[in-house]
UniProtKB/Swiss-Prot annotation:
Ranges per topology, Cytoplasmic: 283-350, 642-653, 707-730, 784-832, 1119-1124, 1172-1194, 1245-1278
UniProt subcellular location: Late endosome membrane; Lysosome membrane
Gene that this polypeptide is encoded by: NPC1
Name of the protein described by the UniProt record: NPC intracellular cholesterol transporter 1
Site (Important for cholesterol binding): F108
Transmembrane segments: 262-282, 351-371, 621-641, 654-675, 686-706, 731-751, 760-783, 833-853, 1098-1118, 1125-1145, 1151-1171, 1195-1215, 1224-1244
Chain segments annotated as coiled-coil in the UniProt record: none
A cellular component term, taken from the record's GO annotations: plasma membrane
């Protein structure tokens, strides 16, 4: 039974109809010319024919699956050669992923040569053709249907969709699909490759996609390879960069730090609010406890000043002196005697002192003939030894300076958007206003006019052609112009090119534009126009660089055109640089004067910022002059003390005020001159800030000295020189304390590496010290002469004229301001009920300032550095509003890496076989997280493109077999042979000598339709070839772009993240500790590096300044530790409150504001040191009395000297045209004066009345002995 069933089954199988796939062709050989050098294939319906042996190499190279048996195929050798030629472009871009290219070869090999063509190819249109050689009539295949399995098409697309094109920072399919890579899919890619309009296919092939038989046709559905699979035993899978499957999960950025909150509120606010409430509770609790205690045992601690008592020592002061008291008293006495003798000498010998002062001033100021003013922004903002500056120098030396940029951003405000209707069908496409054909023609006219601008330098004519960046020079000398009009080769005729008839426009500039923004490197668009997209300079014009204001990637919605003219920059070649600057000057003048009502233009040139900074300085000179004039006028009038109208011209001190001002200015000139001698250049900050600072210090000292004399009464038998010497002995220690502490603080501030702070600190420290020296020498002598003039009743200024005799002598007198401070202000401020209110208010303000301390913005808005009326302000606004690409960034691998070994190559490259943590791969990974890393695109990789270029399957790398010279792919010469053999070894990457042999050829090869991988345009400057002891690769770079950067925070974060990436690359390459490393470079890094450490720099500079002030104060007060602590604490409060004002007033932290903070530290010394010292040396009985005396005597001089002087000058700065003056000078100067005045004249006296140091016992005893028996009133008691 079993045997019978088996036999029956065999019989049924034999009888069952079977489908037999016979081998049959649809074509064989090539026939007539389709167009250009493209030919039709000849129709042929017979069996496949044996391939001639001279075609064996080709079929092994292209279609090794057919190389078996007698190699019978449906193609001849000529067809195979055509197939190879047509595959050159895909080969260059897709062969970096072997499985992708394997599937593509499968598609074309089956189409061209398969012995079973008739199963999946259907000829749909033919025409007769007469062979001109044999006169035989043949048939051209004009149209064809190709039945392709849908699963095969999808698998091929999936294997290729991630493949990168390193030279264009884009996906390879974006260049091969006729669409943007994101819009490409399996079907439209294959349709595009088979469309004759793509410039490569000789005739139309219509693909039909199906996984099932259709109309008796069996779709070609060969096995495919995934991109994570190897195509053979020796070839690796595709790299992570070209195959996302290999990469594993996409890296995720770390989550942003959660805001620090308490109960949902900002933690700093909550903490400071609780702290302040706790302080108030403790403080007022203690206050009321003490108040109740005092009510029980005492009447009040407060007693008014009795100016008839030289000192007042209560019982508690009769105790023993501490160990430091004698030292302090001795030091105080030494300083008093020294300055007393010196003052007497200066008054007795005015001619000698003034003469030598003038000699000193002349000698120092003469250095100004060597003055150099730094206006280069790089020198202003970046220290020569900073990391960014050193990296810039390295980049400039090895690759040349980053090109100079001339850029226009153009809008069409009067033009509406329009709708384009594609032919024959398709959704309507909106086009933005600047993409109107008439606007484009006008913009092209403007662009051509700019190209024709000429400038004159050294009696020579300079044109754009002389200075522009021409990457293919000398083969192609066209300038690089990044403009949408370069899609039309900067030609009016190409822009007007259209195809159509009387009824329809089939293709015009809209069609070409939509194609070029998807494939900017294309040499032939797929429309009927067949115009190239490649720029005339030989490179692609990426749409995100030339269009602005669009949404997502809808470039057709652009609302702005961006035109960029890169100009060569020069390293240490001043003449060439000045030629470029001369042309830029004419460019700026041209665009400024260009008139076109249809266009609104924002523009910049490389020199624009420097030019506008210089113009800003010139434009604000008038404002600054008025500011100083007001201060000078006030000083001159306020120094005098008029007692009657008759003596107005006698008692005025205009001449003395002018002399004091000239001394201040002379000290500034001396400082500038001394440092000019040693070659230290000036900066704009020094010129603008130091006169203000020195005037503050100098005027304060002048008022203290003059008013101390005015309140003093000459003792019986005392001469003028003795009186002035005694007055100087009383006030000069205070002047010395403030000036010397500021000098030391500023000089220590010069330890900062920030150029602005470093330079300012040096100049300021020396200027303040010289000012003090001139004041205790020259000014004392001048004061003595002025007093003699006054005593002789001679008029001020007109000293030869005598005034009317009134019988009165020059007597001690008190000004109205002094009387106000003495009789009204001081008693009111120091009343028992007022002092706690003052403390509570000031601590409250301090608490608020601490709460917002971490909220002050960091950076400097570029537009703020420009005048209000500058064209650059509009340009900066346009950048943030319209631009879609950030600055280019170069990841530089320093000289020292071995590129010739497989290990060294794998550490760098991003293609097949490269490490998953290679340099290129890590930058590629960073671009996937662009919102976090601020890296916008995959990097262009010269080494990956070189490996694709040198492959033996490619027609790119060929040499003359006789001369061994390089043959470009466009050269047709039988002597040109492939560089490397088509063997398994030849298909591997070149190593050792081969690597270096062919690399120079790659770097000199220009791209062309047969080889788009030539590296001349893209990489000629990216690779240093070192000659000498064997040719080797030196420093190289890998370029990409940052994302759009708009704010200072964006720029700072971009720099920080780029350095983090480079550091990680250096570490994973294992070259930490080597002589070379990877670092990022972009043109803006030198300007924003300071902000990476600005907080640390601020803490360091202000901390050093406070430390210096503390030490100097403690020493000069005779080891009065507690006085120094109180004074420095008050100055620290001023600084913290400055940050509060900065937050409230929108002032960011940067080098300019840091200089002002350092200066505010110095000015605060002026407000605080005199009060503190007056309190310390006062002999009154209680702290309240001593605080009142100090405030009465010194407060009025400080208020009239520094506060009123500066306030008048500052108000004028509010009217400056410069935004930087308005924000960083007017606002900060006003804040530092108001905060300094309120803390020095309100808070500090109150604080001293609570916790000030006790009376120096040794000094008290000495004072009592010194004035025992005298009846003279002492208004100032030191």
């Amino acid at each position: 039974m079993t045997a019978r069933g088996l036999a029956l089954g065999l019989l049924l199988l034999l009888l069952c109809p079977a489908q037999v796939f016979s081998q049959s062709c649809v074509w064989y050989g090539e026939c007539g010319i389709a167009y250009g050098d493209k030919r039709y294939n000849c129709e042929y319906s017979g069996p496949p024919k044996p391939l001639p042996k001279d075609g064996y190499d080709l079929v092994q190279e292209l279609c090794p699956g057919f190389f078996f048996g007698n190699v019978s195929l449906c193609c001849d050798v000529r067809q195979l050669q055509t197939l190879k030629d047509n595959l050159q472009l895909p080969l260059q871009f897709l062969s970096r992923c072997p499985s992708c290219f394997y599937n593509l070869l499968n598609l074309f090999c089956e189409l061209t040569c398969s012995p079973r063509q008739s199963q999946f190819l259907n000829v749909t249109a033919t025409e007769d053709y007469v062979d001109p050689v044999t006169n035989q009539t043949k048939t051209n295949v004009k149209e064809l249907q190709y039945y392709v399995g849908q699963s095969f098409a999808n698998a091929m697309y999936n294997a290729c969709r991630d493949v990168e094109a390193p030279s264009s920072n884009d996906k390879a399919l974006g260049l091969l699909c006729g669409k943007d890579a994101d819009a490409c899919n399996a079907t439209n890619w294959i349709e595009y490759m088979f469309n004759k309009d793509n410039g490569q296919a000789p005739f139309t092939i219509t693909p039909v996609f199906s996984d099932f038989p259709v109309h008796g046709m069996e779709p070609m559905n060969n096995a495919t390879k995934g991109c994570d699979e190897s195509v053979d035993e020796v070839t690796a899978p595709c790299s992570c960069q070209d195959c996302s499957i290999v990469c594993g999960p996409k890296p995720q950025p770390p989550p942003p730090p959660a805001p620090w909150t308490i109960l949902g509120l900002d933690a700093m606010y909550v903490i400071m609010w609780i702290t302040y409430m706790a302080f108030l509770l403790v403080f007022f609790g203690a206050f009321f406890a003490v108040w109740c205690y005092r009510k029980r045992y005492f009447v009040s601690e407060y007693t008014p000043i009795d100016s008839n008592i030289a000192f007042s020592v209560n019982a508690s002061d009769k105790g023993e002196a501490s160990c430091c008291d004698p030292v302090s008293a001795a030091f105080e006495g030494c300083l008093r005697r020294l300055f007393t003798r010196w003052g007497s000498f200066c008054v007795r010998n005015p001619g000698c002192v003034i003469f030598f002062s003038l000699v000193f001033i002349t000698a120092c100021s003469s250095g100004l003939v060597f003055v150099r003013v730094t206006t280069n922004p790089v020198d202003l903002w970046s220290a020569p030894s900073s990391q960014a500056r050193l990296e810039k120098e390295y980049f400039d030396q090895h690759f040349g300076p980053f090109f100079r940029t001339e850029q226009l951003i153009i809008r069409a405000p009067l033009t509406d958007k329009h709708i384009y209707q594609p032919y024959p069908s398709g959704a309507d496409v909106p086009f933005g206003p600047p993409l109107d054909i008439q606007i484009l023609h006008q913009v092209l006219d403007l662009q051509i006019a700019i190209e024709n601008i000429t400038a004159s330098y050294d009696n020579e004519t300079v044109t754009l052609q002389d200075i522009c960046l021409a990457p293919l020079s000398p083969y192609n000398t066209n300038c690089t112009i990044l403009s949408v009009l370069n899609y039309f080769q900067n030609s009016h005729s190409v822009l007007d090119h259209k195809k159509g008839d009387d009824f329809f426009v089939y293709a015009d500039y809209h069609t070409h534009f939509l194609y070029c923004v998807r494939a900017p490197a294309s040499l032939n668009d797929t429309s009927l126009l067949h115009d190239p997209c490649l720029g005339t300079f030989g490179g692609p014009v990426f749409p995100w660089l030339v269009l602005g204001g669009y949404d997502d990637q809808n470039y057709n919605n652009a609302t702005a055109l961006v035109i960029t003219f890169p100009v060569n920059n020069y390293y240490n070649d001043t003449e060439k640089l000045q030629r470029a600057q001369a042309w830029e000057k004419e460019f700026i003048n041209f665009v400024k004067n260009y008139k076109n009502p249809n266009l609104t233009i924002s523009f910049t040139a490389e020199r624009s910022i420097e030019d506008e900074l210089n113009r800003e300085s010139d434009s604000d000179v008038f404002t600054v002059v008025i500011s100083y004039a007001i201060m000078f006028l006030y000083i001159s009038l306020a120094l005098g003390h008029m007692k009657s109208c008759r003596r107005l011209l006698v008692d005025s001190k205009v001449s003395l005020g002018i002399a004091g001002i000239l001394i201040v200015l002379s000290s500034v000139a001396c400082s500038l001159g001394v440092f000019s001698y040693i070659g230290l250049p000036l900066t704009l900050i020094v010129i603008e800030v130091i006169p203000f600072l020195v005037l503050a210090v100098g005027v304060d000292n002048i008022f203290i000295l003059v008013q101390a004399y005015q309140r003093d009464e000459r003792l019986q038998g005392e001469t003028l020189d003795q009186q002035l010497g005694r007055v100087l002995g009383e006030v000069a220690p205070s002047m010395f304390l403030s000036s010397f502490s500021e000098t030391v603080a500023f000089f220590l501030g010069a330890l900062s590496v920030m150029p602005a702070v470093h330079t300012f600190s040096l100049f300021a420290g020396l200027a303040v010290f010289i000012d003090f020296l001139l004041q205790i020498t020259c000014f004392v002598s001048l004061l003595g002469l002025d007093i003699k003039r006054q005593e002789k009743n001679r008029l001020d200024i007109f000293c030869c004229v005598r005034g009317a005799e009134d019988g009165t002598s020059v007597q001690a007198s008190e000004s109205c301001l002094f009387r106000f401070f003495k009789n009204s202000y001081s008693p009111l401020l120091l009343k028992d009920w007022m002092r706690p209110i003052v403390i509570a208010i000031f601590v409250g303000v301090l608490s608020f300032s601490i709460a917002v301390l971490n909220k002050v913005d960091i950076g400097l808005d570029q537009s703020l550095s420009m005048p209000d009326d500058s064209y650059m302000v509009d340009y900066f606004k346009s950048i943030s509003q319209y631009l879609h690409a950030g600055p280019p960034v170069y990841f530089v691998l320093e000289e020292g890496h071995d590129y010739t070994s497989s290990k060294g190559q794998n550490m760098v490259c991003g293609g097949m076989g490269c490490n998953n943590d290679s340099l290129v791969q890590q930058i590629f990974n960073a671009a996937q997280l662009d919102n976090y890393t601020r890296i916008g695109f995959a990097p262009s990789s010269w080494i990956d493109d070189y490996f694709d270029w040198v492959k033996p399957q490619s027609s790119c790398c060929r040499v003359d077999n006789i001369t061994d010279q390089f043959c470009n792919a466009s050269v047709v010469d039988p002597a040109c042979v492939r560089c490397r053999p088509l063997t398994p070894e030849g298909k591997q990457r070149p190593q050792g000598g081969d690597f270096m042999r062919f690399l120079p050829m790659f770097l000199s090869d220009n791209p062309n339709p047969k080889c788009g991988k030539g590296g001349h345009a893209a990489y000629s400057s990216a690779v240093n070839i070192l000659l000498g002891h064997g040719t080797r690769v030196g420093a190289t770079y890998f370029m990409t772009y940052h994302t759009v950067l708009q704010t200072s925070a964006d720029f700072i974060d971009a720099l920080k993240k780029a350095r983090l990436i480079a550091s990680n690359v250096t570490e994973t390459m294992g070259i930490n500790g080597s002589a070379y490393r990877v670092f990022p470079y972009s043109v803006f890094y030198v300007f924003y590096e300071q902000y990476l450490t600005i907080i640390d720099d601020t803490i360091f500079n202000l901390g050093v300044s406070l430390g210096a002030i503390f030490l100097v104060t403690m020493v000069l007060l005779g080891c009065e530790l507690w006085s120094a602590v109180i004074m420095c604490a008050t100055i620290a409060m001023v600084l913290v409150n400055m940050f509060g004002v900065m937050w409230l007033w929108g002032i960011s932290l940067n080098a300019v504001s840091l200089v002002n903070l350092v200066m505010s530290c110095g000015i605060s010394v002026e407000f605080c040191s005199h009060i503190t010292r007056a309190f310390t040396v006062s002999m009154k009985g209680s702290r309240v009395e001593r605080a009142e005396e100090a405030l009465a005597h010194m407060g009025s001089s400080v208020f009239s000297g520094i506060t009123l002087t500066k306030f008048g000058g500052i108000v004028v700065l509010a009217f400056a045209k410069s935004q930087i003056f308005q924000i960083f000078y007017f606002r900060m100067y006003l804040a530092m004066v108001l905060l300094g005045a309120t803390h020095g004249l309100i808070f500090l006296p109150v604080l001293l009345s609570y916790i000030g140091p006790s009376v120096n016992k040794a000094k008290s005893c000495a004072t009592e002995e010194r004035y025992k028996g005298t009846e003279r009133e002492r208004l100032l008691n030191f």
